[in-house]
Amino acid sequence: MTTEIHDATINLSIVSHTNIGKTTLARTLLNRDIGEIADRAHVTVTADPYPLIDVPSGARLILWDTPGFGNSVNLAKRLEARSNPLGWFLGEVWDRVANKSQWLNQKALLHVRDITDVVLYLVNAAQLPEAAPYVAAEMKILKWIGKPVIVLLNQMGEPKPSREERLEVQRWKDALKGCDIVKDVLAMDAFARCWVQEFALFESIGKALPPVYEKPYAELKAAWREHRKKAFYQSAEAVSAFINARVSDEAQVEDISLLDRVRLFGKSVGLFKNADMTGDPAKKAQTELVHRAEDDFNTLARELLAVNGLTGQVEPKELFGRLKASWHQASAGKKAKAGL
């Protein structure tokens, strides 16, 4: 008989080789800034917990960001040797003095082994599995941890057709098919992923968890889906409102004298280069439309950032560069011609 747990705390740990993108992915899943991101090894030095989702019943899902593996081969040997006194001494005492990063790795992995329910193992998809020498050693580390593993393919590059993505995922599945601890392989780029991929991840996590977590995890998964769907629908509504406002926006162009028309034509063909055209009614109307579009776009950007739990600045220069170059100007028809 399986005992159900209702107020469970389920722990997920993101692990990977150093500088693969663990903290970036954690930020994406958490929808908030955590830790430090830099293009160097060993930026994260401790295992840190972050609440991912919770429900009224008391169930919680916790995401742990961990230090990246450095020398995976030596680290695997250290972990495997911890069961004997000399191995323990080297790992706990010697490495603490002589190899601080390896000592921190061991402390973090001991914690992962003791508390984690599912391990999320991040790899660099830009490399072929057989061309990533650290993977074999890190599979030994994950086997030592002894928890179910879901492999996530990061750094997938530009979005590609679904068939190509499936082939890439299958290539990694084939390379890891001898590893019993690996329960699934998924594409999960920290930048190019979408919420549908997150749903697939949550499905895989549920299948990897022990049966006692079935009910609380179902509640957590449902809450996560609703949270993500709400953000998606709010984002879609905001974008739709912006597009609709731009499509229906217009500005009246004032009529100009014959002399001003001649000057405008002359400037357009290279004559009157120094002519003052600040009074050009068409330019005034275009400027008015662009300013409204800029204001609305900045409002949209702030709304999308808030809805999706992001921070940062948006640079709309490219968009408004195109707006200033692409125009449709409708003119009133002559009454005499309209009567024909």
What are these model-derived regions, one by one?
Residues 1-88:
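Conserved G1/Walker A P-loop phosphate-binding module
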Residues 29, 33, 70, 120, ...:
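Conserved NTP-handling cores and scaffolds of large molecular machines
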Residues 29, 33, 172-176, 205, ...:
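Hydrophobic, Leu/Ile/Phe/Ala-enriched alpha-helical segments that form helix-helix packing faces
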Residues 43, 128-131, 194:
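Alpha-helix N-cap/loop-to-helix initiation residues
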Residues 83-184:
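Conserved C-terminal guanine-recognition region of P-loop GTPase G domains, centered on the G4
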Residues 155-223:
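Canonical P-loop GTPase G-domain recognition
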Residues 195-198, 205-340:
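Extended helical scaffolds that flank P-loop GTPase cores
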